[in-house]
Design a protein with these regions (language model features):
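Short polar catalytic/cofactor-binding loops
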Residues: 72-75, 253
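Patatin-like phospholipase
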Residues: 61-67, 75-212, 226, 261-283, ...
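Eukaryote-biased recognition of electropositive, low-complexity segments
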Residues: 337, 382-383
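Active-site gating loop/helix substructures
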Residues: 202-228, 235-343, 483
Length: 515
């Protein structure tokens, strides 16, 4: 076995080991390997499935799927309404200038928690009106509807006001105090459109600790607000040119991130569309949740059921919590769902000796736009209780880890393409040996993961050709209770900030594949 044969096998083994680091990304990394050894039919050598092609042969001709990812973050979601409005204007203009004026604004919208709610409002509008036109205005209207006046905080803030009037430099600003005490008042009395307290608080029936009561809130105000702006169930179709809705939640018993999908996963014997989510359950038995009619309001509430606020949301006998617990930035769920859908669409036809046009058989590449509500870099170490709590939330909710994974996938694709070009002048025997490697099967690591030939996985190769991040930044008046501040002053400010920051400061360009 020469160096190139050893290298090929080594790459496969590396991808198997990489699954320990990130099982969800394993298949995409394997795809990256196979992207380097893409296939074309060669009329003079019919038995060869591996042929040389340049770096851009496939990606120059592949369709691009444009995806929007919306983080969770409670009231901070108003920022996404402004950012989306600016994005819709920016992308519409760019598409017209490039001669793609008929291109859909987004093909996929994925969200967690409040991001899932925003996503549902947007996709529902497109399904109902058969156009993206007006969707940005609809989302802004939704947030204006959710907002409420600043409550009377005079009594609650008396101690702060006394120190503030003494010019105590440690005292919060007047705006920070308004936000902080408004949320404290909301926690006592609720807000009309989002949550209301369930009284009395739940007693501790385990330790019987009188100080350990659990305050819970009713979801009905939020449910009614969502249903006023989105129609359920939401079932969409690629063939109809409708956007795909991905909603992420957390299975409490299994401790797993779960994605609900508006696109079909197959058809039954009567040709009726099947929509379902399958994931490993107890003792590795697969858990199957079917929702053939589409994503319901329960799926949205499951994505937004904060343990600190709401009871579990039950779906098909399973109990769910907020998706942000495990995946506040659902990039990995987007990548996996994109791959699985196109595996289904392309089918399971054997590839050997049959590929004529690689571009027509492979998964469309992804262009991702991510609207972050949290930032991990602050360059400060707070010492006050509220500041420390806020900093903890920022770091925990940012999810930079998953952004790095998506970047890593593309880096591996590019690296292996370069290795391929180095090997393009090797002899036919070497290529034949590599073909044998590609006939090997992947290792199935769970009951829900299929074992495929590496050759078959060629059909699902794709890249993240663009990743743009729009990130909200805190101002000097920020507080740890920012996710609960639904006052009209704050909501209007967040919408404006989202719009202006998207236009004035061009989104951070993380990945841009030059064709």
């Amino acid at each position: 076995m020469d160096l190139w044969q050893q290298s090929a096998r080594a790459w496969i083994e590396m991808y198997k080991d990489a699954a320990v680091y990130s099982q969800k990304i394993h298949n995409s990394w394997s795809d990256a390997f196979l992207h380097a050894f893409g296939t074309k039919q060669n009329k003079s050598t019919e038995n060869a499935t591996l042929q040389s092609y340049t770096q851009n042969d496939v990606h120059m001709n592949k369709k691009k799927i444009r995806a929007l990812i919306l983080q969770g973050g409670g009231a901070l979601g108003a920022f996404q309404a402004g950012a989306f409005k600016a994005l819709s204007e920016k992308l519409t203009r760019e598409d017209k200038q490039s001669g793609n004026g008929e291109r859909p604004l987004f093909d996929i919208v994925a969200g967690t928690s409040i991001g899932a709610i925003n996503a549902a409002v947007l996709v529902s509008h497109v399904v109902e009106n058969k156009t993206w036109t007006g969707s940005a205005e609809k989302l802004v209207e939704f947030w204006e509807y959710l907002s409420c006046p600043t409550p009377d905080i005079t009594k609650m803030s008396a101690a702060w006001r006394k120190e503030h009037e003494k010019n105590n430099h440690g005292a919060a600003s007047e705006e920070a105090a308004r936000r902080y005490y408004s949320v404290k008042e909301f926690l006592k009395s609720g807000t009309d459109k989002v949550y209301s307290p369930i009284l009395p608080p739940k007693d501790d029936e385990k330790f019987f600790d009188l100080q350990n009561k659990r305050a819970l809130y009713d979801k009905q105000p939020l449910k009614k607000s969502i249903e006023k702006f989105a129609k359920f169930p939401i079932a969409t179709s690629y063939e109809k040119g409708q956007p795909r809705l991905l909603v992420v939640s957390t299975d409490v018993a299994e401790g797993k991130s779960v994605a609900f999908d508006s696109y079909e996963k197959g058809k039954d014997l009567n040709e009726k569309e099947i929509r379902k989510t399958v994931y490993d359950g107890f003792n590795q038995e697969p858990t199957v949740i079917e929702y053939n009619d589409g994503i319901s309001i329960q799926h949205i509430l499951a994505s937004a059921s904060l343990p600190e606020f709401y009871e579990y949301e039950e779906i098909a006998g399973r109990k769910f919590w907020d998706g942000g617990i495990l995946s506040n930035t659902p990039i990995r769920e987007l990548i996996q769902a994109h791959k699985e859908f196109w595996e289904y669409k392309i089918g399971s036809t054997e590839l050997e000796n049959s590929i004529v046009d690689v571009a027509s058989l492979t998964v469309p590449d992804l262009e991702i736009y991510l609207v972050n509500l949290w930032h991990s870099d602050d360059n400060s170490v707070p010492s006050d209780p509220d500041g420390m709590t806020e900093r903890h939330m920022d770091i925990k909710s940012h999810d930079q880890y998953y952004v790095n994974e998506s970047i890593l996938i593309t880096h591996y694709v590019h690296l292996i393409e370069k290795l391929l070009r180095l090997g393009n002048n090797k002899n036919y025997e070497l290529k034949k040996e590599i073909n044998e490697i590609l006939k090997d099967h992947t290792t199935s690591r769970s009951t829900t993961e299929k074992s495929n030939k590496y050759l078959d996985i060629i059909k699902t190769q794709f890249e993240i050709t663009k990743l743009e991040i729009i990130e909200r930044r805190d101002d000097i008046h920020t507080t740890s209770s920012k996710i609960g501040d639904f006052t009209s002053e704050t909501i209007k400010k967040l919408i404006k900030e989202g719009y202006e920051s998207t236009w004035k400061k061009y989104p951070q360009l993380v990945i841009q594949r030059q064709q």
